[in-house]
Regions:
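An N-terminal boundary/leader segment
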Residues: 1-41
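Aromatic/hydrophobic pocket-lining residues that form the small-molecule binding cavity
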Residues: 15, 44, 89
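Short secondary-structure boundary/hinge segments and terminal tails
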Residues: 26, 44, 112-115
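Long amphipathic alpha-helix in the N-terminal Rossmann-like dinucleotide-binding domain
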Residues: 42-49, 100-101, 110
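Short amphipathic alpha-helices and their capping/turn segments at secondary-structure boundaries
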Residues: 49-55
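Short glycine/serine-rich loop/turn segments
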Residues: 57-135
């Protein structure tokens, strides 16, 4: 993170290209992993295009699904909450953005954040990246 932000601030890395690289990687691994369940790469690229400063300048970051991100759902993996769209960012997301971070989407979580295994009826199971047979 530190190296990415320093390179963006110095003009050596393009934050839009960084987001594009993350989007490519997501496309390759998402079917097996199912970790980033609400991607927002187009919006993230547009935001990255105007970021050049801050301690997290241009650093792509996912946000756990329990935190509000304007325009995305916060379901906690509970079917009755599906479809409800956040009207504003949670305080932690506001701080992330203020520091120059680029929100690429929301990451899956256990239903109601109750268990240790990430699986819920809204977004499904997230698998271990090195052993997709495990959750």
């Amino acid at each position: 993170m530190v190296a990415i932000a320093a390179a963006v601030r110095a003009g050596r890395r393009d934050p839009v290209a960084i987001v594009a690289g993350v989007a490519q990687r997501h496309a390759a691994i998402h079917p097996a992993i199912n970790a980033l369940i609400q991607p927002r790469f187009e919006a993230a690229a547009a935001e990255a295009a105007v970021i050049a400063a801050g301690p997290l300048a241009g650093v792509p970051a996912s946000v756990k699904e329990c935190f509000g991100v304007c325009g995305l759902q916060t379901t906690l993996g509970i079917p009755g909450r599906a479809g409800l769209i956040d009207a504003e960012d949670a305080a932690i997301v506001q701080r992330l953005r203020a520091a120059g971070g680029v929100v690429i989407g929301k990451a899956n979580l256990p239903q109601a954040m109750y268990l240790h295994e990430t699986d819920n009826p809204v977004w499904g199971r997230t698998n271990h990246p090195r052993d997709p047979g495990r959750g």
